[in-house]
Amino acid sequence: MTTKEFLTIIQKEANQIDYERYLKQLVYKKVSSDNKIAIFEVNNKYIASWIKSKFTNLIQHCFEIYDGSKPTIEIKLSNEKKSKKEILKEQTQNESTESTILNPSYTFDSFVVGPSNQMAYNASLAVANKPGIQYNPLFIYGGTGLGKTHLLQAVGNHAIEKGNTVIYVTIEQFMNDFTFSIKNKNMEHFRNKYRKCDVLLIDDIQFLSGKEQTQEEFFHTFNELHNAKKQIVMTSDRLPSQIAGLVDRLKSRFEWGLTADVQIPGLETKIAIIEKKSELNGICLSREIINFIATNLDNSIREIEGVLIRINASASLLNQEITLPMVQGLLKEQIKETKENVKLPDIINIVANQLNIKPSDIKSKKRTATVANARRIVIYLVRELTHNSMPDIAKFLGMKDHSAISHNIKKANELIEKDENFKLIIENLKNKIINSRE
């Protein structure tokens, strides 16, 4: 069977959207000598992973239709070596594959929504449903690893399903395309590509800073798309007004539509993210483990994803059961780093602010129920989140000896076991303290 014959069969058998987005990129390479393994190649790792997880049975079915065989399907990443001449030809004659390929797992369904990202999510869904109608441009900003790219690509995936033409690039790719087109005197191709789409998605727009010639080109691209009521969505790590080296006319245009921020997730959202990511990756975690990860890690979703990969790899490669001690061992160094960065005065300030008392009250001789409770929480969190010894804590809080510290830690542990409200207060404060290091 040739690639052409295979594509003819699978186009008839597959959903048309799946065929256009993923399956038509398959290149049939060979079948093993015993006819048991059929090997295909594709030039994008996300597409390869998606096809492996979703379409191997369908591909097998195509072989059954063709000759009655049912080989095992292997999907490999293409590593063909091409001459510089061939690469240049592809770049000038074809649409950039990188600019249109989206990670198929980045959808609205797989995005965990919480108070920290609700507005950005709602706005993204609105523009994906009706591109160019409202919130144009949509400017999503926030810290690294909080889900901006996920939302951006979810807009693209959703818009494609509705029949729109979508271009997705990082601003670096846009700049590289622009430079390449000038060098090869092919600006017509460049402008047709970026100005004729229904939806333009630009990641990390802040890196346009200081690039005067590219800013000029992007200004005209923006105007043409906006005037034609085509949707523009951008992400950045800061507001347009805060991007140094960006011309004022672009700053003002970036704020024509809606700016929506993605904030650090709260504890509940972080727990939901861990639950969702572990479910999608087939990792079974107990509530105890999920809470441990949520309260001890920084807030980057990428870091959470990395930890889940490590847990899964350790469990499968070492044939280990996923238990709390196992996860604690894996995260030991990351938690150690957290402890080195958290300072005792910061804990006092955050607890006092949360419980509406003065920081000085916690270090005072006051024994009211509110102050005593706040002091107990501080002592517990200092032991949990720092390397301070009990004598150090007693000295800092002006207490006579460390036996009172030990008593408060014991009491806090008892309350965590019995009182759900106290436990939630502790978890929320722990999360706030870790967040404060950002």
From Swiss-Prot:
Keywords: ATP-binding, Cytoplasm, DNA replication, DNA-binding, Lipid-binding, Nucleotide-binding. Residues 71-100 are annotated as: Domain II. GO terms for cellular component: cytoplasm; plasma membrane. Residues 1-71 are annotated as: Domain I, interacts with DnaA modulators. Gene3D superfamilies: 1.10.1750.10, 1.10.8.60, 3.30.300.180, P-loop containing nucleotide triphosphate hydrolases. GO terms for molecular function: ATP binding; ATP hydrolysis activity; DNA replication origin binding; lipid binding. Pfam families: Bac_DnaA (PF00308), Bac_DnaA_C (PF08299), DnaA_N (PF11638). Its main location: cytoplasm. The keyword DNA damage does not apply. Oligomerizes as a right-handed, spiral filament on DNA at oriC. This is Chromosomal replication initiator protein DnaA. The gene is dnaA.
